[in-house]
Amino acid sequence: MTHSLRPPKNNEDKKAWVALGSKYEKEFVKLLGKLRIKAEINPQKKADPFAPDLLVEGRVAELKTRRTPFFKTAQYGISPDTATTINKKDIERYIKTNPGMVIFFWVYWPAQESYGVKVKECCGVWFARMDKLKKICDSAPVK
């Protein structure tokens, strides 16, 4: 279960983060299988580690797993209860190669407090097509 997966102690350890991401991808595929949604790790990832993460119902998909709230978003008028991020360079790369690709945000964190900010428990899976997400991000007040 993903509750036992822990982030690397060194935030700059890219190899450890990639390994953790691979574990989350496998767990997410299992979760979708329990929901009778056909999913697998993208076979292209063996040759290209930057290839999209998954194939879901035959469609290319990317997984973003979030396990920590962004407490400081409250300073920008964005609720930290559900705030997340995505790298602009990731969106630009995927728009060029597969604009209709789906991105899944798999989110879980318990209710907690940090930096004087309380957040509620957040648990769920949200998804959007990359081209739609780009439009949202292009018009976002925070870049």
Regions found by a protein language model. Give the residues of each.
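Catalytic cores of nucleic-acid endonucleases
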Residues: 11-18, 64-114
